[in-house]
Every structure is written in C-alpha cells, then in structure tokens.
C-alpha cells in the first residue's frame, strides 16, 4: 500500500456540540419543522448515524432514514421539490448530483467527514495521474470533485462485488479513501488494489484488545463490524457489512446479544429491526474517558432540531447545496455506473434465488 496520508497523525478539529434543548424547546422545533416541511414542499432524509430523535422525525414526517445513496435515491423518486438532508456535506452533494432540479438544504454546511477531508482533490488527482494504468474506484464518502475524477463510485454494500467484477476483467485498482475498507475488499477478492490511506475517525477507534475484553463479559454475544474498522477488528466479527447489511444481520443472527462496532446512531433502526435483542456498543480505543469520537460522528451530531429548523427557514448560502454543472456531470458518470451495476447485481441475485 502506498502511504500518502497518515490518519494516525491527523487531528481533525471537531465541531462544537449543539446546545442542549429543554423538552419544551424540542417540542417547539419539532412542530416548527413539520410546518416548514409542508410550507416548502420539502421532505427530510436522515442518515443512520444521526441522533435517534432526528431519525424518528424523518420517519414521522414521511421522509426516510437510510445510507447516503438511498437518501439521494429516495429524494429522486419523491414528489417534494426540496430535500432537507440530515447528514454530512458529501451526502448533500450526492443528493444534488442525482437531483439537480431540486433544492437541497442541510442543517449546516460545516458538517464534514474525515474520509472526505482526508482525500483532497489536488493530492488525489496527482496520485491517480502517477498510476494511469489503474481504474479509479472511490467510496461514496468523498467530495463531488473526487467523484468526478473517478471511474467508479461505490458504497460498502456492493464494494466486494464491484471489485470482483473489475478484477475479472483484469483491471488493477486505485481505491480511495478508506484504507481499512480497501484492505478488506482486497483480502476478500484478491484483486490488485492500491489504497489511499484515509480513515473514518469513528471506526478507526475500535481496537481488538478492548473488544476481546468485552467478549469475555458477553461470551454468547455476536460481534457486528463495519468494514471501515481496522482489519484486526473485522477478523473478530460474526458479521461484516454496510449499515443496511449490519441491520439485516442483527435480525437474522441467532444470538440475543449483539456487540456493534459502528456509529451508535445505527441503534435506532437496528433496535426497530430486532426489538427482542440487546444491543451493546463496542468499546472505542479510550473506552470512554479518552476516546475522541466515542463511537458517534461529531459532524453527524451537528444535525440537531434547531439547526434543521434554521435550514428550512433560512435556506440561502449557509444551508443550500450547490454543485458546479460541469463537476456534477463528471461525478454523475461514475455514480450512474454504480447504480447500473447495483441494479444488474440485484437482477442476477434474484435470478439465482
């Protein structure tokens, strides 16, 4: 692997947490948001990693809770003219790329992603230019500019299948930006994969030793791990997968106790899927006192009720997502390739069932 970016030496400035709201204030903002959604002909889409009360509000108002791609696809089929995207900035960009005719609003445009931040377009373009014989595959957690530089965009749910497909064609791969997911995909497929060295600040904190100690306390529990986690943690898992795949695994695994190594925001939908099971947070490196993310993305936490109400009410430069037309056209090519591949994959799976 070619180390261009050492996430261990990169300390991202975390945003301030939203100010705590009283019960009355929360009720006020929930009511205000519902009114604004109706007035603006808007629908709310929220990521699995946002706070539970935000996910609940999205569902209550006819929106959806999903991963970044499904959020954008939901918006493209919904009649609303405005999408309120509760997530991080690249998710708003993806929604705009797939829905250029719609207004895309976010609670804040300052909600970042360490994978996006860790893959700046200028450095990444130089890296790609240095390896012109390789097919460029980038994760959805990237900027519109990085997507436009890529041949393919991919989500974790179909990453293994896509790399297997490209490998069968004899193609060598550049993978960006997550080194752990890239390592996992390479190990699963045996493909020639050159990885950019980014990492998710949440999943990178899960460590084997702490997880082993927790397993001793809960010997009958199954371990569920997102592949953005370090390889040693992934190797301990009973199930490895994307957010939606982990929720499905929680439903189907026979164990009644589940240790979950991903952002704790997923517990809202996971508990809905298996209310009879006990969900346990996998320990992060610091096990509380010294952890940085503590298993919850600090930028996802910026999507509070007050910020959502402000985004719907104010709009404008502080809340609306714009993507340059040429950049959008460039990013749409690898995104559509992924969507077409995913559709054909579902057809093949259905045909083999």
UniProtKB/Swiss-Prot annotation:
Top-rank EC class of the record's enzyme: transferase
Pfam families found in the cross-reference section: NadA
UniProt GO cellular component terms: cytosol
Co-factor: note: Binds 1 [4Fe-4S] cluster per subunit.
Entry binding sites for [4Fe-4S] cluster: 113, 200, 297
Pathway(s) it belongs to: Cofactor biosynthesis; NAD(+) biosynthesis; quinolinate from iminoaspartate: step 1/1
Gene3D superfamilies attached to this UniProt entry: NadA-like
Annotated keywords: 4Fe-4S, Cytoplasm, Iron, Iron-sulfur, Metal-binding, Pyridine nucleotide biosynthesis, Transferase
Single GO molecular function: quinolinate synthetase A activity
Family: Belongs to the quinolinate synthase family. Type 1 subfamily.
PANTHER family (UniProt xref): QUINOLINATE SYNTHASE, CHLOROPLASTIC, QUINOLINATE SYNTHETASE A
Protein name: Quinolinate synthase
Source organism of the structure: Pectobacterium atrosepticum (strain SCRI 1043 / ATCC BAA-672) (Erwinia carotovora subsp. atroseptica)
């Amino acid at each position: 692997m070619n180390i261009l970016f050492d996430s261990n030496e990169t300390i991202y400035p975390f945003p301030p947490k939203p100010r705590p709201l009283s019960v009355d204030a929360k009720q006020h903002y929930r009511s205000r948001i519902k009114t604004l959604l109706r007035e603006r002909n808007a629908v709310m889409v929220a990521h699995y990693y946002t706070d539970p009360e935000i996910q609940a509000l999205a569902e209550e108002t006819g929106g959806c809770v999903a991963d970044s791609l499904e959020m954008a696809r939901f918006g493209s089929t919904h009649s609303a003219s405005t999408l309120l995207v509760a997530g991080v900035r690249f998710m708003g960009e993806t929604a705009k790329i797939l829905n250029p005719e719609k207004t895309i609003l976010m609670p804040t445009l300052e909600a970042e992603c360490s994978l996006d931040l860790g893959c700046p377009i200028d450095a990444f373009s130089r890296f790609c230019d240095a390896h012109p014989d390789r097919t460029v595959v980038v994760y959805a957690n990237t900027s519109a500019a990085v997507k436009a530089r890529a041949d393919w965009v991919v989500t974790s749910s179909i990453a293994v299948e896509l790399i297997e497909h490209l490998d069968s064609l004899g193609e060598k791969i550049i993978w960006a930006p997550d080194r752990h997911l890239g390592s996992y995909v390479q190990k699963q497929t045996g493909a020639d994969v050159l990885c950019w060295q980014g990492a998710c600040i949440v999943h990178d904190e899960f460590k084997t030793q702490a997880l082993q100690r927790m397993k001793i306390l809960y010997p009958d529990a199954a371990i569920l791990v997102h592949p953005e986690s370090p390889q040693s943690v992934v190797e301990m898992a009973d199930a490895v997968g994307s957010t939606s795949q982990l929720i499905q695994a929680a439903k189907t695994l026979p164990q009644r106790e589940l240790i979950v190594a991903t952002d704790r925001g997923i517990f809202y939908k996971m508990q809905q899927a298996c209310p009879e099971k006990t969900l346990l947070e996998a320990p992060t490196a610091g096990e509380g006192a010294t952890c940085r993310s503590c298993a919850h993305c600090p930028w996802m936490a910026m999507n509070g009720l007050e910020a959502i109400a402000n985004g719907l009410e104010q709009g404008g430069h502080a809340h609306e997502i714009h993507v340059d037309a040429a950049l959008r056209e460039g990013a749409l090519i690898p995104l559509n390739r992924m969507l077409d591949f995913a559709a054909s994959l579902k057809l093949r799976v259905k045909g083999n069932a």
